[in-house]
Amino acid sequence: MVLAGPAVVLADAPTVLGDMSLWEYCVAKGYADVTLTKPQIGPNAAFNNWRCVTAEGDLRPFSMVQVCKWEYNLTAVQAHPIDKNDAYTWLCYSVGH
């Protein structure tokens, strides 16, 4: 008797959708602007840096994945920077296709 093991299914690699319109995202969500909280270039500058700005000047964090979902009208997305040390290198990727 031969028993087969579990089937291996390989998922497609994520596909680049493109960049993000962060200012447009923040404005569409009711904010006045978008800003960085630390320099554009530096150690891990891509992470925990971008914020939407309220009309009063308060800063509100947001998810890059949510920006990708909004930008490309998809739910199965990922967001990754090309360079973790540059805040301007985020891209959106489609997954699960």
Where are these regions (language model features)?
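Secretory targeting and sorting signals
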Residues: M1-A11
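Mitochondrial intermembrane space
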Residues: V9-H97
